[in-house]
């Protein structure tokens, strides 16, 4: 497990210490990250690893959001730019850029993100569905989580990993 993931777990543990949750309320855990100016999250159970950017190889005839493939300890995985997937312009990587290595069933891929934020705990009752009028890509979004004074868009890993080419 990477040090960043351990740090996120530690911060989450500290934040939850002393806070009283009702026993009958389901609390879901996510990893938060920034793409552009917005905060997104994916379920913590889908995260295998968080790594600093490593080299990747372009693959011809793939959508522009598939940056290519990268080799992580002898395993080759596709690398998906969430910026490009969401229709934002590409940005060069910087010191905050990370790859989230995610899994859904037997599919594994890397998500190229702008910046990691924190481990997030949200009560199921604090997650609202996405209004249908907002986007044609609603299937990518599980819902909008409300945490303190901010909103976090919760993504469906399984939908992002679906091939649309």
Curated annotation (Swiss-Prot):
UniProt GO cellular component terms: cytosol
Classification via SUPFAM superfamilies: CheW-like (SSF50341)
Observed phenotype of the null mutant: Deletion abolishes swarming.
Cysteine-cysteine disulfides: none
Pfam families: CheW
UniProt record, GO biological process: chemotaxis; signal transduction
Gene3D superfamilies: CheA-289, Domain 4, SH3 Domains
Domain of life of the native organism: Bacteria
CDD domains the record matches: CheW
Family in the record: Belongs to the CheW family.
Record's function text: Plays an essential role in chemotaxis signal transduction system in order to colonize the host stomach.
The name this protein goes by in its record: Chemotaxis protein CheW
Taxonomic placement: Bacteria, Pseudomonadati, Campylobacterota, Epsilonproteobacteria, Campylobacterales
